[in-house]
């Protein structure tokens, strides 16, 4: 009788252990499923990071005209300017995009606020997206609001990852394998470095 009781207890323990393991596996599967379902961009974490980055690039002097305006085509502004520098030990590239009736280098120089349509930013975040050179992408309105695509998704994070059209797919074609067109030797743009110029050498390998 005693042996039977011990056996029954053992069976119960094994059963409970199996149940606990099953529940754990179920939770892991659900967590994995949620991660798989999570969009590559536009999450709360992405937007929060983008908002903080806007404050920092504004304070660091990345916004406004610095004198290297040039003409370009879509999807960016007809007139644009690229500046780069380091914020929080991260390489940051800021492109101001100008457009509208009468836009030209001369008109933008005279009244940049009138023609500014969007500010697009790339932030190098170590380990963020190894498949795509660890760039964080974001598109702002002139007032710093994170803009949305036609589906209502906020354009911050791994924007359009895995899609045939969008930031990542377009920049993959940039020469030098760094996803940055303004580092191309043939591009018709000069890039202004903002802030401590000694940091430029430190980040030189990221700008080839």
Label for each model-derived stretch:
Residues 1-8:
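Bacterial N-terminal signal peptides that target proteins for export
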Residues 2, 45-55, 197, 201-205:
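Polar/charged alpha-helical tracts
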Residues 24-104:
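N-terminal secretory signal peptides
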Residues 18-22:
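Sec/Tat signal peptide C-region and signal peptidase I cleavage site
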Residues 8-17:
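Hydrophobic helical h-region of N-terminal Sec-dependent signal peptides
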Residues 10, 44, 125-127:
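Homeobox/homeodomain signature
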């Amino acid at each position: 009788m005693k042996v039977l009781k011990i056996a029954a207890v053992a069976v119960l323990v094994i059963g409970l252990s199996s149940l606990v393991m099953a529940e754990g596996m179920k939770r892991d599967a659900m967590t994995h499923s949620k991660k798989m379902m999570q969009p590559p961009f536009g999450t709360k974490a992405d937007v929060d990071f983008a908002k903080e980055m806007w404050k920092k690039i504004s304070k660091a002097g990345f916004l406004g005209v610095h004198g290297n305006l040039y003409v370009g085509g879509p999807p960016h502004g007809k007139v644009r300017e690229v500046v780069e520098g380091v914020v929080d030990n991260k390489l940051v590239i800021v492109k101001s995009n100008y457009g509208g009736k009468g836009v030209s280098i001369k008109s933008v120089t005279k009244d940049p606020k009138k023609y500014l349509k969007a500010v697009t930013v790339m932030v190098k975040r170590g380990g963020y997206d190894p498949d795509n050179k660890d760039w964080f992408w974001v598109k702002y309105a002139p007032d710093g609001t994170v803009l949305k695509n036609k589906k209502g998704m906020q354009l911050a994070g791994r924007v359009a990852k895995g899609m045939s059209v969008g930031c990542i797919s377009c920049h993959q074609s940039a020469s030098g394998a760094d996803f940055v067109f303004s580092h191309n030797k043939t591009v018709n743009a000069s890039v202004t470095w903002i802030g401590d110029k000694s940091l430029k050498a430190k980040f030189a390998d990221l700008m080839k």
